[in-house]
Amino acid sequence: MRRLLAAVLTLLPCAVHAETVTFGLDWKAEAEYGGYYQAVATGIYAKHGLDVTVKQGGPQVNHTQLLLAGRLDYNISSNSFLALNFVKENIPFRTVASMFQKDPSVLIAHAGQGNDTFAALKGKPIMISSDTRVGWWNFLKARFGYTDAQIRPYTFNLAPFLSDKTAIQQGFLGSEPFSIKETAHEEPVVMLVADAGFTGYASLIATSDKRIRENPDQVKRFIEASIEGWYSYLNGDPAPGNALIKKENPEMTDALMAYGRESLKKHGILDSGDAAKDGIGAMAAARWAAFYASVRDQGIYPAGLDATKAYTLQFVNQKAGMGK
């Protein structure tokens, strides 16, 4: 009994002193966030002294605003444009890790219509969201000569695409292609924007400069635990994370989550490029500089913007979680 009591008392300080962290996603719970749910479900965050609540996003949720208002401690910034927006607007928040080395955004078309390359889509109507219009769409305009006259609204409803064989729309690698296969029983043409040369990071974790300055240890533990969660989800048994995802978002099926996870693995979304040697979450100053130069030359951002304020390398490139 004394030994049991001693063991319990030894564990209590960890539980009592676990720091509460609220983390916002940029979309609904799905395999593209599997590493975070895996870190919660398997106790990885707890092992790092953190009590993490993951809040899913959605079309009516603006977690960036909640982060800036202090209602979230960390959130997912979808792409590098959002990080540069912080700098442009002189907002004291920045990226502390980039979980996706490749942006999983895709353009999707029907097979057999001649719409199987990015170049072939020039001048043709394409359904995209308002966020995409101010994001990687600008890369496609500069790279392939697309124009805004091609834009048609995308409302995250597949019906317009499925009813028109000439339709082209945006999507995410691990979701819309699967739904199209399941619904229409056809294999769509899927073109990964990153494969066309888009170098922006994706699924970045952002937090405040104040937190980085005043509690760098928490930031370090949160990033390292998240990275460990991702290695566990990709290379181990994803069942614990998937169970939490389904609890949060009952629309997720086992088949869809398996497809999403396999898409991440097959295309090296998390562990390619610099992450192959420096670990998931890796970032490089040279890549940030090149990305800024490209979007500056497209007129999206002004000359003289200090892109180094968009990120910090303090918590990444340390091979955290590798081999686990």
Model segments located where?
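Positively charged n-region of N-terminal signal peptides that target proteins for export
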Residues: M1-L4
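N-terminal signal peptide c-region/cleavage motif recognized by signal peptidases
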Residues: P13-A15
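Ligand-binding "clamshell"
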Residues: E19, N85-V96, D148, S163-T166, ...
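Short, glycine-/small- and polar/acidic-enriched structural segments
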Residues: T20-Y154, L158-S163, A167-G174, T199
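Sec/Tat-exported extracytoplasmic proteins
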Residues: V40-G43, H48-G49, R71, I76-N79, ...
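Periplasmic-binding protein-like
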Residues: M99-I108, H185-I212, I223, R261, ...
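Secondary-structure end/capping motifs
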Residues: R213-Q298
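Conserved C-terminal helix/tail region of periplasmic/extracytoplasmic solute-binding proteins
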Residues: A285-K324
